[in-house]
Structure formats: structure tokens, C-alpha cells
């Protein structure tokens, strides 16, 4: 199968990878968690062990460093936070144009749910997954699932 036989999404996915991800306290800039792993791989459930103190923060700054061989007209993410398979929150992020053969860093701020909606870490631990769909416009590039453990 040659590169002409691949769909647009498959072609982008083949040359796309996450190099690292960093979570910071949005108020102080202090690094809470960092992982040098490609969380975009679709055929495996990834795991992330994040400090429990993240649940007490007003907002978290997420930094994703990624590389792509193919250009993307409108790179965007749809994220769903699921508790035992049920959607608790959904977020939409848009980066826009990404050049071919580039490495990029994308920073976004995620605000915490109201305190009245928060659940204790012992209830959340291992029961929360983040499902991320990566798109170029409406073309799905890849979909990944990360299960969260609070340490």
C-alpha cells in the first residue's frame, strides 16, 4: 500500500507524534507533571500518574509538544473526561494552521470544575479516562485514551 492509498487522516497520523506533555499550576507556573511519551497512539489505553494536588488547583496549564510531517490547515482537539465511561466534561481546543515538517508547542489553560462538582481522589482514581480526538478541520487524525491515577 503506497502513500497515495492512505486516507488524509491516516497520512497525517503516520507522521504525527506527541514528544512530551507538561501540566503546570496555571497560577504559579510550577510543573506538576511531565511525561515524555507519545499519548497519541490510538491502539492502546495509556496511563498517567498525576499528583493528587492537581485536583485542588484553580486551573492547569497544559503544554503539548508535537511533531508532524504533514501540514494541517486547522489542528484541533476534542477532549472528553469520562468517569466510569460517562462523560463528566468536554473541552474543545483549536490551534489552527501547523506547517509541514515542524515541531510545535501548544499551551492551553483548563479551569477546574466548581468545587461543588468535585469528587474525592479515592473515588476518581483509576475510574477517569480522558478521550482525546485529534483533528485537522473535520478529518480525524487519531483518537487516544488516557486513564488517570492520582498519586
Swiss-Prot record:
Q: Which SUPFAM superfamilies match?
A: E set domains
Please give the positions of the paired cysteines in each disulfide bond: none
Listed GO CC annotations: cytoplasm; nucleus
Q: Which GO terms describe its biological process?
A: sensory perception of light stimulus
State the UniProt keywords alphabetically.
Answer: cGMP, Cytoplasm, Nucleus
Superkingdom of this entry's organism?
Answer: Eukaryota
Q: Where in the cell is it found?
A: Nucleus; Cytoplasm
A UniProt-annotated Pfam family? GMP_PDE_delta
Q: What is its main location?
A: nucleus
Q: Which N-terminal stretch is annotated as signal sequence?
A: none
List the PANTHER family: RETINAL ROD RHODOPSIN-SENSITIVE CGMP 3',5'-CYCLIC PHOSPHODIESTERASE DELTA-SUBUNIT, RETINAL ROD RHODOPSIN-SENSITIVE CGMP 3',5'-CYCLIC PHOSPHODIESTERASE SUBUNIT DELTA
Similarity comment: Belongs to the PDE6D/unc-119 family.
Assembly and oligomerization: Interacts with Pde6.
UniProt name for this protein: Probable cGMP 3',5'-cyclic phosphodiesterase subunit delta
Q: Which organism is it from?
A: Drosophila virilis (Fruit fly)
List the taxonomic lineage.
Eukaryota, Metazoa, Ecdysozoa, Arthropoda, Hexapoda
Amino acid at each position: 500500500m503506497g502513500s497515495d492509498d492512505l486516507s488524509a487522516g491516516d497520512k497525517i497520523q503516520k507522521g504525527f507524534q506527541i514528544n512530551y506533555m507538561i501540566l503546570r499550576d496555571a497560577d504559579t507556573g510550577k510543573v506538576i507533571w511531565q511525561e515524555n511519551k507519545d499519548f497519541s497512539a490510538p491502539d492502546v489505553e495509556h496511563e498517567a500518574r498525576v499528583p493528587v494536588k492537581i485536583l485542588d488547583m484553580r486551573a492547569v496549564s497544559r503544554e503539548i509538544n508535537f511533531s508532524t510531517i504533514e501540514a494541517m490547515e486547522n489542528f484541533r482537539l476534542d477532549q472528553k473526561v469520562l468517569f466510569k465511561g460517562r462523560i463528566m466534561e468536554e473541552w474543545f481546543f483549536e490551534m489552527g494552521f501547523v506547517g509541514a515538517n515542524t515541531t510545535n508547542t501548544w499551551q492551553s489553560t483548563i479551569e477546574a470544575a466548581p468545587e461543588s462538582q468535585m469528587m474525592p481522589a479515592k473515588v476518581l482514581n483509576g475510574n477517569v479516562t480522558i478521550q482525546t480526538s485529534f483533528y485537522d478541520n473535520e478529518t480525524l487524525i487519531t483518537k487516544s485514551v488516557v486513564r488517570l491515577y492520582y498519586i
